[in-house]
């Protein structure tokens, strides 16, 4: 199956604006992020803490909607899904 991933701000600098990733059927969000990390230097450190947990300041959008950080890594992806990776928001 093929999943489209869009990177924003600092993630765009590391992985580019948009990439297509081929995954096995039944793959989860964690599998997608691991595949991305293996292809883009510096992405693992930006996404994950040293013990492998997704950094809480990273926002994942799946099918245009925010994901629950406690459950996002176990989302089962489908062919044609779109995932966006956003860095922390700031402003005043």
Stretches with model-predicted labels:
Residues 1-91:
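Ubiquitin-like/PB1-type beta-grasp interaction modules and other compact soluble beta-rich domains
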């Amino acid at each position: 199956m093929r999943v489209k991933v869009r990177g924003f701000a600092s993630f765009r600098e590391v992985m580019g604006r948009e990439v297509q990733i081929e995954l096995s059927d039944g793959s989860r969000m964690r599998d997608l992020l691991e595949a991305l990390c293996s292809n883009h230097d510096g992405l693992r450190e930006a996404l994950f803490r040293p013990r492998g947990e997704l950094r809480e300041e990273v926002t994942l959008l799946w099918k245009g909607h925010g994901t629950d950080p406690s459950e996002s890594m176990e989302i089962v992806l489908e062919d044609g899904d779109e995932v966006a990776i956003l860095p922390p928001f700031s402003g005043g």
